[in-house]
From Swiss-Prot:
GO terms under biological process: translation
Protein encoded by which gene: RpL34
The species this protein was found in: Aedes albopictus
Annotated GO CC locations: ribonucleoprotein complex; ribosome
Annotated region described as Disordered, given as residue ranges: 111-130
Single GO molecular function: structural constituent of ribosome
Keywords linked to the UniProt accession: Ribonucleoprotein, Ribosomal protein
Protein name from the UniProt record: Large ribosomal subunit protein eL34
InterPro entries listed in its UniProt record: Ribosomal_eL34 (IPR008195), Ribosomal_eL34_C_sf (IPR038562), Ribosomal_eL34_CS (IPR018065), Ribosomal_L34e_arc-type (IPR047868)
Length: 130
């Protein structure tokens, strides 16, 4: 005759977080073993590609993991992939170059260079700094 199984938890529905499988114990009994969800690798914030060099884990496990398992040692490591970071660095460099060229052109034409206006502190912020 088949051995009957009793649930270890109260939830009886077959939901994503309540998957079970039957396991035989060393004592010969059949019991339910609750299966954990599959671990995933974090994705790039821009292109949604899996980040390489990061250990797959559940979000609740990540605070207990050491830093070297969660990131790679580079700017935006663990947030952006290498391709998106490269694009961002190049774009920032080109924008800076455009600003420099604009200033040089203005100097050649003899026009005074317009500087961005200074942000004045509000009365509240000024009183706090004193």
């Amino acid at each position: 005759m088949v051995q009957r199984l009793t649930l270890r938890r109260r939830l009886s529905y077959n939901t994503k977080s309540n998957k079970r499988r039957v396991v035989r114990t060393p004592g010969g009994r059949l019991v339910y073993l609750y299966v954990k969800k599959q671990r995933t690798v974090p994705k790039c914030g821009q292109c949604k590609e899996k980040l390489s060099g990061i250990k797959p884990s559940r979000p609740s496990e990540r605070p207990r993991m050491c830093r070297r398992l969660k990131t790679v040692t580079r700017t935006f490591g663990g947030v952006l992939c290498h391709r998106c970071l490269r694009e961002r660095i190049i774009r920032a460099f080109l924008i800076d170059e455009q600003k420099v060229v604009k200033v040089l052109k203005a100097q050649q034409l003899g026009k005074p260079v317009s500087k961005p206006p200074k942000i004045q502190k509000t009365a509240k912020a000024a009183s706090k700094s004193k």
